[in-house]
Design a protein with these regions (language model features):
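Thiamine diphosphate
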Residues: 1-43, 287-301
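Glycine-rich phosphate/diphosphate-binding loops that line cofactor/substrate pockets in enzymes
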Residues: 1-5, 75-79, 116-125, 144, ...
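Conserved thiamine diphosphate
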Residues: 4, 40-44, 48-82, 242
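Glycine-rich, anion-gripping cofactor-binding loops and their flanking helix/strand elements
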Residues: 12, 129-208, 216, 296-301
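Short gly/pro/ser/thr-enriched loop/turn and capping motifs at secondary-structure boundaries
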Residues: 16-18, 41-46, 92, 158-162, ...
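Conformationally flexible catalytic loops at phosphate/diphosphate-handling active centers
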Residues: 76-122
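A short, well-structured juxtamembrane/interface segment
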Residues: 111-121, 136-138, 176-179, 256-272, ...
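Phosphate/pyrophosphate-binding active-site segments
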Residues: 201-287
Length: 301
């Protein structure tokens, strides 16, 4: 996660903007605040035979394009969704003024409103945190988890001290899944890394999903209860973690027996990180290795 303010990227040529499609697809599905800014020639030159007049309006079908030919207030456009700004430039492209046009510019930081609030009443269960955190910070989710008093499974175990490591491994055993099957499961965000955890979720009698995206991007998501905000007032029953701790201990003993492998390598990397490190992890296999084979490290940023 880059944070809660918008991240922008630019393209100035007529072909380079097509390379933004993968990032925009990811931003759309993850509901990330992303701005694609493309430079364009004036609209009057379109379809006239002029060079560099590829029609860039609506080139990214999943997000809205704002075709801009003059100065406007951009703030109303930033609604918490990825957007495309297509900027028309007319000649002269370089001002004849010799003043430093950046002098005196002041950027006011945008405060993030987290969408935390509301009340949740439930009994016993298990909390499962998807790798994307549903857009919440780990601090916000850790606060919620401490109020809930349930066992915690996290697809990103490095950020959650109370999460039970190696859950994706031992939940792959159908007998273990059945033995640990809960009455309630709360899922924060999307669980997309592990089939075993998703099979475990299916065993719950009552499923609660917390994710702001159920309002629009994921409006067909199914659960007994869909919440668009992380509850701040939580009433629940303490759920024992003894069997979860024992399962993690047994799995840990087996993991330590691993000879050199990619799983051993990712553990070695995590062990060598210094305090407050930022760890960037590729998709597919590497992020799944972290989910299944590592445990909380308080030095991971």
């Amino acid at each position: 996660m880059f944070g809660h303010n918008y991240i922008d990227f630019w393209a100035s040529s007529k072909s380079s903007e097509v390379n933004f499609h993968p990032a925009i697809l990811e931003a759309h599905h993850s509901d990330i605040n992303l701005i694609a800014i493309t430079a364009d020639r004036p609209a009057r030159l379109r379809k006239t035979g002029a060079n560099q007049t590829t029609d860039q309006v609506g080139i990214y079908k999943l997000i809205k394009t704002h075709d801009l030919a003059s100065e406007i207030d951009l703030k109303p456009l930033f609604t918490g969704k990825p957007i495309h700004l297509n900027i028309q430039f007319s000649e002269p492209l370089i001002s004849e003024e010799r003043n430093d046009w950046l002098a005196g510019i002041k950027i006011d930081p945008v405060e993030y409103k987290s969408g935390v609030g509301g009340k949740l009443e439930t009994s016993k269960g298990v909390l499962i945190i998807g790798h994307d955190n549903a857009g919440y910070t780990s601090d916000e989710i850790n606060t919620f988890a401490s109020k809930l008093k349930w066992p915690v499974i996290a697809e990103n175990p490095l950020s959650y001290p109370q999460s039970h490591p190696y859950a994706a491994l031992y939940l792959a055993d159908p007998k273990v899944r059945q033995a640990l099957a809960p009455e309630n499961v709360i899922v924060i965000g999307r669980t997309t890394l592990s089939r075993s955890i998703n099979e475990f979720i299916k065993l719950a009698k009552n499923l609660i999903v917390i994710d702001p995206r159920v309002a629009d991007v994921d409006n067909n998501r199914q659960a007994n209860l869909l919440l668009q905000s992380l509850p701040s007032d939580v009433s629940s029953e303490l759920t024992t973690i003894d069997i979860w701790q024992k399962s993690s201990e047994l799995a840990s003993a087996e993991v330590k027996k691993l000879t050199w492998s990619e799983q051993a390598a990712i553990n070695c990397i995590c062990d060598c990180l210094t305090s407050m490190s930022a760890l960037f992890v590729g998709s597919s296999r590497p992020v799944r290795d972290i989910e299944a084979f590592t445990k909380f490290e308080n030095k991971i940023l």
